[in-house]
């Protein structure tokens, strides 16, 4: 599964935006405990820099907000790949259990769920329906770290 996952990301055209997992403060980009992989909230960071900043519905338009989501979920999936490359455990199965999307939006914004659909769709494309379908939360926020428009975190089962 370890090399298959990375090959699948490449074959599906999932861009790798950073050479290694990134954390912007005193935390780990991911944590593995008891067969569960917790991916810290990912911002739309490309080559170590925030690609977009501002509020969705104001400075950030629909296309840019969708791009933010795809960058965040790509960063999540590449963090999973990095974990798989560095673990010594034998892994047979990876499933996405939960996805949480936080959106820095103007007050009247209502399409949080539609934005998070972009992330859910990519995860299902990579893992398949059986292992990719997940529970999730999409929520609007008054602000996010670094004035990021989007932050997404994920939880995976690793068996």
Locations of regions flagged by a protein language model:
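N-terminal presequence-like segments and the immediate start of the first folded domain
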Residues: 1-97, 105-159
